[in-house]
Structure formats: structure tokens, C-alpha cells
């Protein structure tokens, strides 16, 4: 059996570490060729010692120098340490790997992920923002290069598993409605504030927002789950992965996070994929597809599983989700602007600069500003992303000034 040669973009994050957990179980199947992260020197150093990659990228040159020193001190001399955004792109497209785990968080993962696609590799897509930000442009690159795109998000991986094999082979060009499928049912837990009084949401703290009831995730995606913007981004991603319209996707609240998503067929059947909420399951599925391998995740224990609950979405509680669904209908500019603004707003909330409910205000205003802008190629995507971030930063400055004046007036 020939080993898959892996490049893991975002190796020190939640998805990256879970990927290496699966790889650790199957040394006969996988070889780690390259790792990439932003600044997590200590974590990636330990990964280097264990998995012995040929190349490592830390975007920060300062942190790359620290890693080089740590490797030298450990008498490790056969690992090349690189730095910079271009180095991320270089290792993503380098022909010494055939499979790329694209798990860099946010729009910064777009160009490295696109580079892996253009190189015609098997791309395991955990970076939903890359597809949300570039949509049809990204999928056109997949088609042109012959890359094999496999979804890692638990919901999209679940949908993929529920599809007929011929539709799995047509990712991005699926013809679901013509092949007996009537709807995609995209499930979401509702996050930690599903039952909290709406009028108290403005007082939510970052630590509360990051305390997801079911999943262990990074801080940014945890906040997105609390606002359900994460589900909104997944809604947009589902449109492109499965070639459907917004009207063909329905979001269903499922607090237990046991059913990861469902596909509804025209004959009344609904096929669901379920399991314990652990990202190693979809990662193992995509790494070994079309085979099945051990993931390290215990199978679902039906006798100790709570009864399944399903609820409609309350958009008053989750306005960010409604905004994302509308952006999906409005077009690429709205989606690109929404993602950019949300990254700025969430970072500001995590830094305790704005309130939880201000995230929506920044997002909504940004989408309205850029919804009509032309986006026909990757350069225009990048330009709009930069413009939307700058605009969101301006809005943020206005929020901070208003808050400062308010506090001054109360003294």
C-alpha cells in the first residue's frame, strides 16, 4: 500500500491536531510531508519531533526563527523551516504531497487552499471561508485542475456520506434535484445561548460564547457557533459544494449534535449521518475515502444517547444566520463582505472591544455597503475582502468612540 503524502495547513489548530491524531493511528497509510501554522512554536515543535516532516512553515518570521533554534537545540537538522504567506502557498502546491488538509481559519486560508486545488491534489476542505469568499471562482478551479475536493466540516461531510455515489463523484456539479433528492437538511445545535433570554445576549462574555455545549473548537469558530454565523457560512458552503440553490437547503436545530446533517429524498425518505460529535470521524472519512478506517472515536451508544430533538430556527435570536442566508441569495459580493466583516467583528468581541450583539450590526452594515460590487475573479475577491475589512474596522472605531463618549457622559 502506497502512503498518502500529507500537507497539513493549520496543523496546530483543532482540526490540524485531530488530523494528526488519526494519522498517528495509521502510520502505514499516511506520511506527513509538511506542516504549517501561524505562531504556535511549541506545538509545532512537538509535531516535528513526532512526525518528522520535510518542511514546516510559520507565517511569522520571528516565530520561524524560534522554531529553527529549538530544532537545532534538539539536534534536528533535516527539517526545512520557512516563513511568510508565500511559503504557505508554496508548500500547498508542492508536488511532494498529494493530499492537503486545508484547515487554516478564516479568509487567510483562501490562497493556499486555492494553490492546492490548482495543483490538482486531494484537498480536504476544513476552511469554509475559502469557499464562502470565492464561491464559483473556487469551484471553477476545482473543475479545471481535476482536484478531488472532500468536505471536512461535520455537516458537509455528513451530507456527502448521505448522497448516492455518482453524486459524490460530482462534487460541485451535483444534480441532486434531478436524481431523487428534494432537500438538504443542515443541522446545528444552536450553540450555548439557544435558551438564553434574547434581551440578555448583549451582556454575553467571550468565555461564555466559547463554551460550546457539544464541540471542542477554536475561539473564532466557537463565537460563530454562538451567533450561528457558522451555520450561515456552512449554508453558503453547501450551496457551492452540492450545486443547489438557497431554497433547497433548510437549517434545523438539533441540540444534541448527534445527527450531523440529513438528505431528504423525493420518495419521503430521509437519510441521516450520525455519530458522536468528534471531528476525527469526518477527518478519517476524508483521509481514507472511499475506504473506512479507525478514527479513534467510539461508535454511538444508542442506549445512552438522549432522545433526538429538532426545532425551527428563531431568526430573532440568530440574526447573523438570517443575514448569511440572504447573502447567499444576493451573490458573491455579499458573501465575501460578510465573511470579512465577521472576522473583524468576532476578533473585536474576543478582545472585549464590542458587545456580542454588535457583531451583527457590523456584519449587516458591511453587507449593505458592498452587496452590489462586481466580483468576477480572484483578484477582485481579494480586493473586496480588503475593502470590507477596512470598512468594518471603521465601523469598529465608531463603536469604540460611541462607547467612550457614553462612559464619559455617565461619569
Swiss-Prot record:
<feature type="binding site">
    <location>
        <position position="225"/>
    </location>
    <ligand>
        <name>1-deoxy-D-xylulose 5-phosphate</name>
    </ligand>
</feature>
<keyword id="KW-0479">Metal-binding</keyword>
<keyword id="KW-0414">Isoprene biosynthesis</keyword>
<feature type="binding site">
    <location>
        <position position="230"/>
    </location>
    <ligand>
        <name>1-deoxy-D-xylulose 5-phosphate</name>
    </ligand>
</feature>
<feature type="binding site">
    <location>
        <position position="234"/>
    </location>
    <ligand>
        <name>1-deoxy-D-xylulose 5-phosphate</name>
    </ligand>
</feature>
<dbReference type="Pfam" id="PF13288">
    <property type="entry name" value="DXPR_C"/>
</dbReference>
<dbReference type="GO" id="GO:0051484">
    <property type="term" value="P:isopentenyl diphosphate biosynthetic process, methylerythritol 4-phosphate pathway involved in terpenoid biosynthetic process"/>
</dbReference>
<dbReference type="Pfam" id="PF08436">
    <property type="entry name" value="DXP_redisom_C"/>
</dbReference>
<feature type="binding site">
    <location>
        <position position="153"/>
    </location>
    <ligand>
        <name>Mn(2+)</name>
    </ligand>
</feature>
<keyword id="KW-0560">Oxidoreductase</keyword>
<feature type="binding site">
    <location>
        <position position="15"/>
    </location>
    <ligand>
        <name>NADPH</name>
    </ligand>
</feature>
<keyword id="KW-0464">Manganese</keyword>
<feature type="binding site">
    <location>
        <position position="231"/>
    </location>
    <ligand>
        <name>1-deoxy-D-xylulose 5-phosphate</name>
    </ligand>
</feature>
<comment type="pathway">
    <text>Isoprenoid biosynthesis; isopentenyl diphosphate biosynthesis via DXP pathway; isopentenyl diphosphate from 1-deoxy-D-xylulose 5-phosphate: step 1/6.</text>
</comment>
<dbReference type="InterPro" id="IPR013644">
    <property type="entry name" value="DXP_reductoisomerase_C"/>
</dbReference>
<dbReference type="InterPro" id="IPR026877">
    <property type="entry name" value="DXPR_C"/>
</dbReference>
<feature type="binding site">
    <location>
        <position position="14"/>
    </location>
    <ligand>
        <name>NADPH</name>
    </ligand>
</feature>
<dbReference type="GO" id="GO:0070402">
    <property type="term" value="F:NADPH binding"/>
</dbReference>
<feature type="binding site">
    <location>
        <position position="155"/>
    </location>
    <ligand>
        <name>Mn(2+)</name>
    </ligand>
</feature>
<dbReference type="GO" id="GO:0030604">
    <property type="term" value="F:1-deoxy-D-xylulose-5-phosphate reductoisomerase activity"/>
</dbReference>
<dbReference type="InterPro" id="IPR036169">
    <property type="entry name" value="DXPR_C_sf"/>
</dbReference>
<dbReference type="InterPro" id="IPR013512">
    <property type="entry name" value="DXP_reductoisomerase_N"/>
</dbReference>
<feature type="binding site">
    <location>
        <position position="128"/>
    </location>
    <ligand>
        <name>1-deoxy-D-xylulose 5-phosphate</name>
    </ligand>
</feature>
<feature type="binding site">
    <location>
        <position position="129"/>
    </location>
    <ligand>
        <name>NADPH</name>
    </ligand>
</feature>
<feature type="binding site">
    <location>
        <position position="13"/>
    </location>
    <ligand>
        <name>NADPH</name>
    </ligand>
</feature>
<feature type="binding site">
    <location>
        <position position="127"/>
    </location>
    <ligand>
        <name>NADPH</name>
    </ligand>
</feature>
<feature type="binding site">
    <location>
        <position position="212"/>
    </location>
    <ligand>
        <name>1-deoxy-D-xylulose 5-phosphate</name>
    </ligand>
</feature>
<feature type="binding site">
    <location>
        <position position="155"/>
    </location>
    <ligand>
        <name>1-deoxy-D-xylulose 5-phosphate</name>
    </ligand>
</feature>
<dbReference type="Pfam" id="PF02670">
    <property type="entry name" value="DXP_reductoisom"/>
</dbReference>
<feature type="binding site">
    <location>
        <position position="12"/>
    </location>
    <ligand>
        <name>NADPH</name>
    </ligand>
</feature>
<feature type="binding site">
    <location>
        <position position="234"/>
    </location>
    <ligand>
        <name>Mn(2+)</name>
    </ligand>
</feature>
<dbReference type="InterPro" id="IPR036291">
    <property type="entry name" value="NAD(P)-bd_dom_sf"/>
</dbReference>
<comment type="similarity">
    <text>Belongs to the DXR family.</text>
</comment>
<dbReference type="GO" id="GO:0030145">
    <property type="term" value="F:manganese ion binding"/>
</dbReference>
<dbReference type="InterPro" id="IPR003821">
    <property type="entry name" value="DXP_reductoisomerase"/>
</dbReference>
<feature type="binding site">
    <location>
        <position position="154"/>
    </location>
    <ligand>
        <name>1-deoxy-D-xylulose 5-phosphate</name>
    </ligand>
</feature>
<comment type="function">
    <text>Catalyzes the NADPH-dependent rearrangement and reduction of 1-deoxy-D-xylulose-5-phosphate (DXP) to 2-C-methyl-D-erythritol 4-phosphate (MEP).</text>
</comment>
<feature type="binding site">
    <location>
        <position position="218"/>
    </location>
    <ligand>
        <name>NADPH</name>
    </ligand>
</feature>
<feature type="binding site">
    <location>
        <position position="189"/>
    </location>
    <ligand>
        <name>1-deoxy-D-xylulose 5-phosphate</name>
    </ligand>
</feature>
<keyword id="KW-0521">NADP</keyword>
<protein>
    <recommendedName>
        <fullName>1-deoxy-D-xylulose 5-phosphate reductoisomerase</fullName>
        <ecNumber>1.1.1.267</ecNumber>
    </recommendedName>
</protein>
Amino acid at each position: 500500500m502506497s502512503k498518502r503524502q500529507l500537507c497539513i495547513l493549520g496543523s496546530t489548530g483543532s482540526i490540524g491536531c485531530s488530523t494528526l491524531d488519526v494519522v498517528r493511528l495509521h502510520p502505514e497509510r499516511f506520511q506527513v510531508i509538511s506542516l504549517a501554522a501561524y505562531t504556535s512554536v511549541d506545538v509545532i515543535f512537538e509535531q516535528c519531533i513526532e512526525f518528522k516532516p520535510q518542511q514546516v512553515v510559520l507565517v511569522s518570521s520571528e516565530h520561524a526563527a524560534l522554531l529553527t533554534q529549538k530544532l537545532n537545540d534538539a539536534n534536528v537538522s533535516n527539517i526545512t523551516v520557512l516563513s511568510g504567506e508565500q511559503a504557505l502557498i508554496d508548500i500547498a502546491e508542492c508536488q511532494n504531497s498529494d493530499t492537503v488538509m486545508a484547515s487554516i481559519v478564516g479568509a487567510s486560508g483562501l490562497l493556499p487552499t486555492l494553490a492546492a486545488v490548482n495543483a490538482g491534489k486531494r484537498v480536504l476542505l476544513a476552511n469554509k471561508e475559502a469557499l464562502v469568499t470565492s464561491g464559483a471562482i473556487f469551484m471553477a478551479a476545482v473543475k479545471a485542475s481535476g482536484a478531488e475536493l472532500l468536505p471536512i466540516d461535520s455537516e458537509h461531510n455528513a451530507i456527502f456520506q448521505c448522497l448516492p455515489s455518482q453524486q459524490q463523484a460530482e462534487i460541485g456539479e451535483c444534480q441532486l434535484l434531478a436524481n431523487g433528492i428534494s432537500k438538504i437538511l443542515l443541522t446545528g445545535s444552536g450553540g450555548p445561548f439557544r435558551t438564553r433570554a434574547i434581551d440578555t445576549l448583549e451582556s454575553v462574555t467571550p468565555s461564555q460564547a466559547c463554551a460550546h455545549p457539544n464541540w471542542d473548537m477554536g475561539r473564532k469558530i466557537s463565537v460563530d457557533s454562538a451567533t450561528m454565523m457558522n451555520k450561515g457560512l456552512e449554508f453558503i458552503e453547501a450551496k457551492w459544494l452540492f450545486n443547489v440553490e438557497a431554497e433547497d437547503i433548510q437549517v434545523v436545530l438539533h441540540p444534541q449534535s448527534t445527527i450531523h446533517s440529513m438528505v431528504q429524498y423525493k420518495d419521503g425518505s430521509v437519510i441521516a449521518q450520525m455519530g458522536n460529535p468528534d471531528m476525527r470521524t469526518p477527518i478519517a472519512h476524508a483521509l481514507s475515502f472511499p475506504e473506512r478506517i479507525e478514527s479513534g472515536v467510539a461508535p454511538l451508544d444508542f442506549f445512552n444517547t438522549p432522545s433526538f430533538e429538532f426545532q425551527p430556527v428563531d431568526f430573532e435570536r440568530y440574526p447573523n444566520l438570517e443575514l448569511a442566508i440572504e447573502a447567499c441569495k444576493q451573490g458573491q459580493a455579499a458573501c465575501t463582505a460578510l465573511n470579512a466583516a465577521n472576522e473583524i467583528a468576532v476578533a473585536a468581541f474576543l478582545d472585549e472591544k464590542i458587545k456580542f450583539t454588535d457583531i451583527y450590526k457590523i456584519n449587516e452594515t458591511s453587507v449593505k455597503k458592498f452587496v452590489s460590487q462586481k466580483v468576477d475573479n480572484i483578484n477582485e475577491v481579494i480586493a473586496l475582502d480588503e475593502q470590507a475589512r477596512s470598512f468594518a474596522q471603521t465601523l469598529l472605531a465608531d463603536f469604540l468612540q460611541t462607547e467612550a463618549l457614553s462612559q464619559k457622559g455617565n461619569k
